């Protein structure tokens, strides 16, 4: 069963993504910002198949988190999400470390498909 770490400062988005992804039997852990997520990744020694993170967050944004996670836990696949065009543009420079960027708001089907694609891509690398 794949383990997914979901990071978003908006509780409603975190819970929507968690419920959607749990439908496929994945184990879910959540964090409210990048610093908390990095702490969880470290304490769990990067034992996650996927990091699904919002880009715009307080304390540590998703891009800083993605860079740190890719450096410290290169086996963890990274999937970004944002509702802002400028943040999506910032993320375009991360194609070497991030599988894709999901545009918010998204449907349950959208996030399930994006996660399935990212997990499949992670297994093939």
Q: What function would you assign to each model-found segment?
A:
Residues 106-119, 123:
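C-terminal output helix
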Residues 81-82:
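Hydrophobic/aromatic residues positioned on beta-strands within the core alpha/beta folds
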Residues 62, 93-102:
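As written
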Residues 30-50:
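Acidic, metal-coordinating helix/loop segments flanking the phosphotransfer/catalytic sites
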Residues 53-54:
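Active-site T/S-Asp motif of two-component receiver
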Residues 33-36, 61-65:
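Acidic catalytic/metal-coordinating carboxylates
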Residues 57:
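Receiver (REC) domain active-site loop signature in two-component systems and cognate sites
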Residues 15-23:
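Charged docking surfaces used in two-component/phosphorelay signaling
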């Amino acid at each position: 069963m794949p383990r997914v770490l979901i990071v978003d400062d908006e509780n409603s988005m975190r819970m929507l993504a968690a419920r959607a992804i749990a439908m496929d039997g994945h184990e879910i852990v959540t964090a409210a910002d990048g610093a908390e997520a990095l702490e969880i990744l470290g304490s769990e020694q990067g034992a996650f198949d996927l990091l699904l993170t919002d880009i715009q967050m307080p304390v540590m944004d998703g891009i800083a988190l993605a860079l740190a996670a890719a450096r410290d836990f290169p086996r963890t696949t990274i999937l970004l999400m944002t509702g802002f065009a400028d943040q999506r543009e910032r993320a375009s420079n991360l194609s070497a470390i991030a599988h894709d960027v999901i545009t918010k708001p998204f449907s349950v089907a959208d996030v399930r498909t994006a996660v399935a694609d990212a997990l499949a891509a992670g297994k093939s690398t």
